[in-house]
Each structure stands twice: as C-alpha cells, then as structure tokens.
Amino acid sequence: MDVQLQLDLNEEEERGFKDLILLCNKEDETDYDMGLDYDFFYSIRNEEKKESGLKEEYLAILMGYKLGEQEEGKDILLCTVFVHPFMRGQGLFTMLSESLYDDFREQRIRFMRKNKEESFLHFPYLYSEYFLEKTLEPPIAFPGERRSYPFGEVYFSAYNEKSLYLYGLMVENRFRRQGKGEAILRDCLEKSEAGVYEKVILQVDSRNKAAMKLYMKMDFEIKDSLSYYDGERKRRKDGKDI
C-alpha cells in the first residue's frame, strides 16, 4: 500500500473521502463535518478490494491546513485522520503521519479530534475549542458589526438569517475583573431592539478561563468541541526520529 499526497481532489476522490468519513462517523458515533476544505490530502487507496474484502475506495486519509499563527517561528498545521474501522491497528496511521513528517519537516503538527482525551495515541493533549450557542428570548435586531463602550468593544456578524456570530469581545485592561464583559453582553443581547435574530454563536479556547466562565454565566451552551494534540514526531535521546 502506498501513500499519495494531493493538493486537490476530483469529484470521484471527494466521494471516496466522504464515504470513509461517513463510515467512521457511524462506527465512532461522531459527527465530523463532511466538508473537504483543506490545503493537502494524504490517502491510502483500497487497491485490492478482493483481498481486503472492503468496498470503500479508501482505507485511510489524513487532511490538513495551515493555521494562521506560528509557534517558535514555525507554521502550525492542523490535521485530522480517518482510518477504516476494519483496518485500524495495522499501521496505516503511521504510514500517513510519516509521510506528513517527511514533507513538512519545518512545521508544527497538531491533530484534531472530536473527543477529549489525555492523549491521542501517544500525542499529548494541548487544548480544546468549544462552540457555544445562546438562545435569545426575545429575538433581537442586529446590534452592529462593532459596538463600542467606554470600557471595551464587541464585534458581531450575521451567521445566517436567524443567528448572530460573536467574533470578538474586548475589555480594556484597567476595567477587567469588574464585570464589564458581562455588562457589554447583557446590553447587546438583552437590551437591543426586537428583531429576527434568535441565537448567538461563538467559539472560545479552553485556555481562556475567564471567557469560558463569563459565557457559562451568560447561559451559553456547549454545542460542539474540537480537541487538539501535539503531533510532533517523537525523537530518541540521540536526536534521531523514532
């Protein structure tokens, strides 16, 4: 079995990738997005279907994209992996990841998973990203893309016809720990004019403890999450790759 690297997929390849993701979702009771908006794709095809006894076109896939930030001067790649349920524990993940390491030696690797664990395989847990949602009763009008206060600012966009996306909340340093973040949110979400927006959604990093505490106090609910793991290639004491 060979590992193939691609930067783009044709329609047939997209169907094959989505079939494998759907199969893994059913097996693992997860709900990974079927979208394929990634920068690169590694795959292992099911070239010997009679031998494997499996109908799917792909046995394993690894997909990733470059995050818009750096760590110690190196770009960060976020990657996710799907291995056919009947082919797990047979080294396919290792084949994919070794190809990734060889091709992206100067990048930091992080693996994304739906489930939070202390470690994913031998990769240590780093942090989680939570997707929060709050129902607005009554519905409100659009509060504005940028709303300024003497002590901070908040930023919104329209996610769809019924939902707002809160993508920024800033409180000046000298006003922090005084309840100003809560005051901003309550003014926007509870005192705005009546309108059509029934929900507000946002994303928050689990390492931002103050923000998580605020949103939980404001009755936001966790609707989904992604956990990230340090995917750096393991090295021996002599500095060589394991």
What are these regions (language model features)?
Residues 2, 7-11, 22-105, 152-164:
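Conserved donor-binding loop and adjoining core beta-sheet/short helix segment
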Residues 68, 73, 85-143, 229-231:
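Acyl-donor-binding surface of acyltransferase catalytic domains
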Residues 1-12, 133-146, 236-242:
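Conserved N-terminal entry element of GNAT/NAT acetyltransferase domains
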Residues 78-89, 169-176, 205:
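A short, internal acetyl-CoA/4′-phosphopantetheine-binding micro-motif in the GNAT/acyltransferase core
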Residues 144-173, 182, 192:
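Intrinsically disordered, low-complexity segments enriched in Gly and acidic/Ser/Thr residues
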Residues 89-102, 171, 177-190, 194, ...:
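Conserved acetyl-CoA-binding loop-helix of GNAT-fold acetyltransferases
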Residues 79, 109-114, 166, 200-204:
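Conserved hydrophobic beta-strand within the GNAT/NAT acetyltransferase core sheet
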Residues 58-60, 124-127, 152, 224:
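A structural microfeature
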